């Protein structure tokens, strides 16, 4: 373990230019994005060259680094043009590329010397010898495989001076650090070249072959047949362990997720790191609030993955041990008039007069109120606003700022385990 605490970088996903700006404004120290080539998220709204330039300029002006994921597994011919791509990224001021394929690493080193290369989690780095190997080729950081334990992480830290990046939040692949071909076989989309259809998230029935007799999951251990769908990672409670063991960068998954998600996770992990760097007492004073905040954007149950032990089926597979989140993202503030306490908001979901909502902003600012004096952009009084991206005005009891987000509570479902291990779904 390190003797002096070092504040880690909070690395936040940004699937679009809008999300990049939100991540920066909500506390990210660095963001990772995808370009239009060599990445693994073909549907993430990847950045054009002009958007990359704008995003880098915006982030750098606020002291935030930008990394580009170029972590696809290349087949013969896929690498054509990569040298020019990496050189262009370097020349526009990019801080690092995230790469897994040795061919792309070699090309980047040759064509774009000086550009930091980070080894992607797709390369499945699970031991310090891997760090030693890639250091010879000029890499400056390694993103650990999600399967690495905290004990292994601590040992790696003692034996390398390369930067360590570790996933702390978001979706986990049921396969080994993304080495999966389910999508290739089931939907003809190559997961390792950006086309994953997330086949592991589908429902499955189990058949006893060759007789073809259907069998339910053993003893109800995997509710609702989500037999390959992993729960999500959340290490917010364990920030002290990550910092004490010298992790340089805390990586949050989710380039395809919403600005609601991006703003919330950036806010929470920045607050957690800042608090623990102040003192352990400061961290534990806000820990429960941080946990509750992250549940507001959760899509699945949350767990610590492989950090502390190999999880059992009931710990790792989706099946609901607590309620589905009861919050929905309804809008963001674009303007505020302090004289009339009127907020102009851009709507993202249906808003009704009288809805109970929560406003939140950078720095962990929160307050709740009811929607009052709802008007459309023409000043007409309305009771319901059903059209996404419409500009609306409301009266608020406290000051808000452009960029603040708005959530509405909604009726949800609760999935509970019963004594026999099966699941039961009830209304919230």
Language model feature labels by segment:
Residues 103-104:
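Alpha-helix capping/helix-boundary segments
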Residues 41-60:
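Glycine-rich, positively charged N-terminal anion/phosphate-binding segment
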